[in-house]
């Protein structure tokens, strides 16, 4: 059985899904609290929760998974192995190389959460078959993504289609990252 694990790392919750790539069926699903700001040994508690979950599921399946996709807020590094920029929350995420941290043989890729949501919608969701799509995510934060002519727009800095951190009132209270209004 070829299998994959998808993880949505949010500001308040971690959602995870194990998927059989051969039958295209869900195997298992769970949700955990993020516990941002808490640490276990020297590692963030949320990162340890993800590592323990993957080990538990691999033991349950009796084999290692083939690939792991992690959707996270923030800007991904160009090589899609880590989050390059995530100010204000999820302490310890910037620069964390997931393949090394998870100690797994699986292929691990990181994506901005809005990008991942949009790719999922065009793969299996309501935007399946669409060539031009815009998606707005609203959760602990606000994000967005766009596909034009069938291609995910990333932009030079990975921010294309990203709606977060738009100042509506330059004299307003700052958000968690310090942007006013």
Where are these regions (language model features)?
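Glycine/GP-enriched mid-protein hinge/lid loop-to-helix segment characteristic of carbohydrate kinases
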Residues: 3, 15-20, 27-31, 38-43, ...
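Conserved phosphate-binding loops in N-terminal lobes of ATP-dependent enzymes
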Residues: 4-72
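Active-site glycine-centered loops adjacent to acidic/histidine catalytic or metal-binding residues
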Residues: 8, 113, 139
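A generic "binding-loop/recognition-motif" signal
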Residues: 12, 114-115, 159
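Short glycine-rich anion-binding loops that position phosphate/pyrophosphate groups of nucleotides
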Residues: 12, 73-76, 139-141
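Hydrophobic "anchor" residues
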Residues: 25-26, 76, 82-83, 152-153
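Glycine-rich phosphate-binding loop and adjoining helix at the ATP-binding site
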Residues: 36-51, 55, 64-68, 74-132
């Amino acid at each position: 059985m070829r299998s994959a694990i998808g993880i949505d790392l949010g500001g308040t919750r971690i959602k995870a899904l194990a998927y059989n790539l051969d039958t295209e069926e869900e195997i298992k699903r769970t949700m955990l609290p993020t516990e941002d700001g808490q640490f276990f040994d020297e590692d963030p508690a949320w990162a340890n929760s993800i590592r323990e979950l993957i080990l538990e599921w691999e033991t349950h399946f009796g084999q290692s998974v083939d690939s792991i996709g992690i959707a996270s807020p923030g800007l991904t590094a160009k090589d899609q192995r880590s989050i390059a920029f995530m100010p204000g929350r999820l302490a310890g995420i910037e620069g964390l190389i997931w393949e090394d941290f998870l100690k797994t043989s699986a292929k691990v890729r990181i994506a901005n959460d809005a990008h991942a949501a949009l790719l999922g919608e065009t793969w299996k969701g309501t935007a399946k078959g669409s060539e031009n799509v815009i998606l707005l995510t609203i959760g602990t934060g606000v994000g967005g993504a766009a596909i034009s002519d069938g291609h995910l727009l990333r932009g030079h800095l990975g921010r294309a289609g990203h709606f977060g951190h738009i100042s509506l009132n330059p004299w307003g209270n700052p958000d968690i990252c310090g942007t006013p209004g």
